[in-house]
Amino acid sequence: MAEIIEKSGLRWLWLAAIMLALDQVTKYWTIQSLDLYESYEIFSFFSFTYARNYGAAFSFLGDAGGWQRYLFTAIAIVVSSYLVYLLKKNASTDRWINCAYALILSGALGNVVDRMMFGYVIDFLDFDLGFYRWPTFNIADSAIFTGAVIMIFESFFAKQAKPIKQPKGNKNV
C-alpha cells in the first residue's frame, strides 16, 4: 500500500488534508466569532461575513426546500470518489494535475462536512468592490476554483504524448 501511495497521485492527499483542515478551522472560527450576517472588515473591499448557503455555487437551488442538501452531498461524494480514483491512477510526478485533483477533492469534502453537520455550507469570504459585490464564499470554494483553473491551464500547456509513428509503407492505419 505504501508503494502505491508513493508512486501514484495519492501522494498528493497531504494537500487535500491540509486544505480541508484549513477550511474547517476557518469555518469554525466564523461561527464562533460572528453572528449570522455579521461582518468584520479587513480592508475596505474585503470582510469576513458569516453567511449560510443552502444551495450550491452562488446559492443555486438555495430555496428549493431542503432536498438539494442530499443531492449536492451525493454529487460531492461521487466526485470525491472519482478524484481519489484519478489520483491513484496518475503517477506522482504528474504534479499539476494531481495538485488540481487534491484541491478539488478538499473543497468538495469541506462543503460535504458542512452539509452533513449543519444542512448548509458556511461562507465567510466577502468581497465588495463598491460597483460589484461577489457572492460570499469559503476556503473550500476557493480550493475548487483554484483546482479547476489549474486543470484548464494544464490542458493547454501539458506536454502531449507524441503519436506512435507507423513504419513507412504500412497503409493499414
Curated annotation (Swiss-Prot):
Annotated GO MF terms: aspartic-type endopeptidase activity
Annotated compartments: Cell inner membrane
Active-site residue list: D123, D141
Transmembrane segments: 12-32, 67-87, 102-122, 137-157
Membrane topology: Multi-pass membrane protein
Annotated keywords: Aspartyl protease, Cell inner membrane, Cell membrane, Hydrolase, Membrane, Protease, Transmembrane, Transmembrane helix
Catalysed reactions listed for this entry: Release of signal peptides from bacterial membrane prolipoproteins. Hydrolyzes -Xaa-Yaa-Zaa-|-(S,diacylglyceryl)Cys-, in which Xaa is hydrophobic (preferably Leu), and Yaa (Ala or Ser) and Zaa (Gly or Ala) have small, neutral side chains
Top-level taxon in the UniProt lineage: Bacteria
Annotated GO CC locations: plasma membrane
Example GO biological process: proteolysis
Pfam family, one: Peptidase_A8
Signal peptide: none
EC code(s) of this entry: 3.4.23.36
Metabolic or biological pathway: Protein modification; lipoprotein biosynthesis (signal peptide cleavage)
Record's function text: This protein specifically catalyzes the removal of signal peptides from prolipoproteins.
HAMAP family, A to Z: LspA
Family named by the database record: Belongs to the peptidase A8 family.
Protein name per Swiss-Prot or TrEMBL: Lipoprotein signal peptidase
Organism: Psychromonas ingrahamii (strain DSM 17664 / CCUG 51855 / 37)
